[in-house]
């Protein structure tokens, strides 16, 4: 039996329920972006990445699909950034979601026990080793409240950043400095524009400082920067929520926690906490007591990006992920 579906028709689907449609539509566009003939195939998708939790489930599927198609066709991307950009286009052009590039880059370029420093001006990257990461864990806590970033909320923040950059005569706030914030205040820009710009400018500096801290094996400093990041997301960018703030404040009560912050776009979803291995169970217990909802916990560490795996290894890793979840 042969069954075919026009991929062009998928592009006209209503995507208001993003988390239910983007995986299918992104996969369809990845097939389109592959040059040459793609042979027919049957596919089963298994995942332990929760959908709609702000953990980049869409990018994970896009990059995994592209990696599979490289293996299937024998046509491997010459440059890793080209692969990441192709997956981003799948979301932009086919799913209609104006996502950034960070999620696709880490899914493609991730290395075990490393962080990835990405400069979005020229898409240059640097692998940052995390030498003593084995002493710590990243505890991901899913608030299980919908990860909802409305189009109006997203556009308001994006437009505020564009407006601030325009007033400063910059191509983007990536070129701005803390001194430029005074210019915005002198120009009597609306308070919300100043706040959005302050978050972006300080977050860029925190990212640079975080990479430097990891290179010095200073996880204490790295944790402090995580805390500062969340506080800025909460007060200046205003994308946190009562649920996320509760998870973060609860985690910070535990002595073995170095830092905790929301992850993803905010407005629900997950937090990520850097914690010493011997304190992770205490963190989970405290959160269960403090958080009125039902949180889900995932223990994670920096791992490699998408790659081809034998079925035996894949099943073993999948079962391990289920146990850790």
Predicted regions and their residues:
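A short glycine-rich, hydrophobically flanked beta-strand micro-motif that places a catalytic Asp/Glu
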Residues: 41-45, 244, 260
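C-terminal nucleotide
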Residues: 1-18, 114-259, 273-325
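A local structural micro-motif
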Residues: 39, 78, 95, 173, ...
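Gly/Ser-rich oxyanion-binding loop with an adjacent helix/lid
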Residues: 3-131, 280-285, 304
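N-terminal pre-core extensions flanking Radical SAM catalytic domains
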Residues: 268-272
